[in-house]
Amino acid sequence: VRILVWHGWLLEGSGSNVATARIVEVWRAGGHDVLLVCQERHPERYPWIDAWGVLDRDDVSTIEPNPNASDAPGRCVLLRPEIGTLLPVFVVDHYEGFEDVRPFVDLAEDELETYLRANVEALRAAAAAHRPDVTFVGHGIPGAAIGRRSLGAGSYVAKIHGSDLEYAIRPQARYRTLAREGLEAALAVVGPSAESLRRCVELVPQTTSNARVVPPGVNVATFRPRPRAEALREVADRLEQDESTRNGRPSALDAEVERALDARDAAAIVELFERYDEDVPELEAAARIRRLAHRDGPIVGYLGKLIPQKGVELFLEALPALRHEAAALVVGFGSDRDWLAALALALRRGDREAIAWLRDAGGLPVDPATTPDAAARVSDLTFTGLLDHRYAPGALAAMDVQVVPSILQEAFGMVAAEGAAAGALPIVARHSGLAEVAAALEDDVGRPGLFSFEPGEGAVYRLVDGVDRLLSLPARERDELRHAVSSFVGNHWTWERTAAKLLAAAEAEG
């Protein structure tokens, strides 16, 4: 099958980015011919990309072969549209190659139309060159409207997520109109969970007739239970060979964070973010992870972006109140990295005044009045920076408990599924698509509420109780649960199943 995919961003970092990459990889492995249109700046990092080029309006540059490409029955070519210096996003973060990264809701009308026009022209040119049998476009906006304007009604399958619904379509009527334009004309509309499709239909009722649930998946060959020490040593060994870490955040900045916190100098904390590359592992990540490999006690972890919407502050607040002596592992990247270092310091000190300042000056979603008192025992906290698909499976396999405290309405909760596949027992916020993931795992083991906590006021205490509940289980019972949740993911949530269901959705409506 000749497949065309439009995705507006990168291939790592967010759930939709990772999902796009994994699905295309599976299609290529299955013998399909895929043309992927996205903004990825480093296609050479992906062995499933055979070649790449640039789309400048309707002109395709010379296609360059990827020297790192692996053998496969199919083929994948990546084309990157030239869309200018503005990249609209749902949640602001740093994006290499773009000077102006702004939320969709902050765009002027002419900026939005310029962005849409550039992508419409690019997708139309890509379709003319590839002549696809089926086209998939990402997100309710902007992908669905780009699909309709470039290819016509009934010519594409639209994939919704969670961020498009909550950070563009819900808050602004113009995006509900734009979503309707694209979704009502789609061959099919697929979403990762029944809950995400319900929200979509609530906002855009015209999607009712052709909506289908297609859960995302996990690469169960790499995300699998492993002995902790072995997994961490392998991650450390690989990191020591990764030259990109030399540009990562150095531990020396922690002293500057402390000085800035003591001086209540917000500008100094902001400035630190410009002094390292957030898109790579931190400079001393290998040494930190190797130290963890020698620990005997439990490890409680978080993997995800370091931004307020993901709730990592809630995780840090919970750590001092745990009854169990556990090491904490924070895997991720994002603009709040140095603010989180300051928060961790304030929590260790039990300094509510500093916590209040971090809330007011840094915008951290913390409340000093509800923050648990600092315990005499302080958790060992390890930050690693970004650990991509090469490292994340080992980091997750090392976690006894994985916390997913997202504040954002998540479409599915893929990171929780990946952790479960690796044997990390999840404790997730019980809302949106995260609740569906937790409920499925809880039903499978016959333990309602075991893997979730209620969000909202007082959530930090319920999170503490949830983590302690899992850590209190006998070691043998925890091991049985680890293998149970891993087996469930392998039987129900794999990328092979996801890729097949997407093609089936297109064929059923075609």
Where are these regions (language model features)?
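A charged, aromatic-enriched C-terminal amphipathic alpha-helix characteristic of glycosyltransferases
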Residues: G15, G458, S472-A506
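A conserved catalytic-core segment of Leloir-type glycosyltransferases
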Residues: L35-H130, E234-R238, D254, R259-D262, ...
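Carbohydrate-associated surface elements
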Residues: E40, E195, G217, A229
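Acidic donor-binding loop of glycosyltransferase active sites
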Residues: L187, R377-D380, A397-A411
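Conserved donor-binding/catalytic core segment of Leloir-type glycosyltransferases
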Residues: V190, E234-K310, L316-L319, L329-V331
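Nucleotide-activated donor-binding/catalytic signature segment of Leloir-type glycosyltransferases, i.e.
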Residues: I269, F273-Y276, G297, A326, ...
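Short hydrophobic beta-strand element within catalytic cores of glycosyltransferases
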Residues: L425-A435, A439
